[in-house]
Amino acid sequence: GWEGQPRVSPDMKAYSKFDFQKSRIAVEVQFGHASFLGTDLLKFQMASYSNLDLIDFGVYITTTKAMQKFLTNQYGHNWDGSLNFEKVEKYLPYFKSAIQVPIYVIGIDV
């Protein structure tokens, strides 16, 4: 099964954890602030390269703008500054020189 909250590396402190991992696939789920994107992506890189060789690829899951709009209209949730699929799609190319591990991005939509 899936392991919850596995460390990026056995030698790293508690703050360096994935949300889930199974075999050599790491998963990050991010509905929070957009500023977490860089940190989340670097965790994939650290676990794949940097002499760790613990994963083959990462999966990054977030909401879409449409889902955020729906949740705002239905429940009044404030998404100001939050990450979404479209932001990941926009900023991911800027990380391509630093991130060599494949990352599959999933946007949860309505």
Give a label for each model feature.
Residues 24, 31-33, 109:
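Short, flexible loop/turn elements at secondary-structure junctions
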Residues 6-11, 58-64:
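Cysteine-centric segments in proteins
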Residues 28-39, 65:
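Short beta-strand-loop-alpha-helix junction that forms the active-site gateway
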Residues 64-110:
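Domain-level recognition of nuclease-like catalytic cores that cleave nucleotide substrates
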Residues 1-23, 35-42, 49:
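Active-site metal-binding core of divalent-cation-utilizing nuclease and nuclease-like domains
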Residues 47-54, 94-98:
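Arginine/glycine-rich "motif VI" loop of SF2 helicases in the C-terminal RecA-like domain
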Residues 50-56, 62-65, 70:
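Conserved acidic-Pro-Pro-aromatic motif
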